[in-house]
Amino acid sequence: MSTDLSQRAPAPGALGVVQQFLNSVDIASGTDVLRTSADVSAWFAERRLFSRPGEQQADALPEVGDADFGRVLQLRTALRDIAEGNLTGRAAPSAVETVNRIAALVPMAVRFDTDNTTLLTPLGEGAELAIGWILAITFDAMNTGMWQRLRLCAATDCRFAFYDASRNRTGTWCSMSTCGNRAKVRAYQQRQRGRALPA
């Protein structure tokens, strides 16, 4: 459970927004910044997820209805579960099913760009647009290989989503100096206790 945020690797570019989305619930402290529809609306607005590229975001925040609020929380849980699978290389089928179900409700389009790239772009309005951005960023990260580096800390009392920037992609903890160190100390203590037991 790292308390030093500077030790936690932020995901690069737009994937950082998805990382923040996954970390909007803090397992260590038991806090959730997306407790209400108003919280979700404010969170999306802070990250400009209610607007398209080149558009100015309206001053009035779109309302997030009950159905969209439920979808946001389901999406966060499912994406956290999928990120957890990045250590093993296999995502939980129920999490994938949830993301697919939500994605089917969000209108999207493939956009071709002048630099010979394609982008998945959400077309909806309000919460639908914001959910679409989370999905589009995740889609892009999965296709570029960046998603596989977004993981949940192996410390069960932490579970922070971190970006594994290690060369060999074997990062396990959000911070080696806290969660990783604690795990190593526990393992050492268990080995010492095992040696101290009479035969």
Name these PLM-found stretches.
Residues 154, 158, 162-163, 167-199:
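N-terminal cysteine/histidine-rich coordination modules
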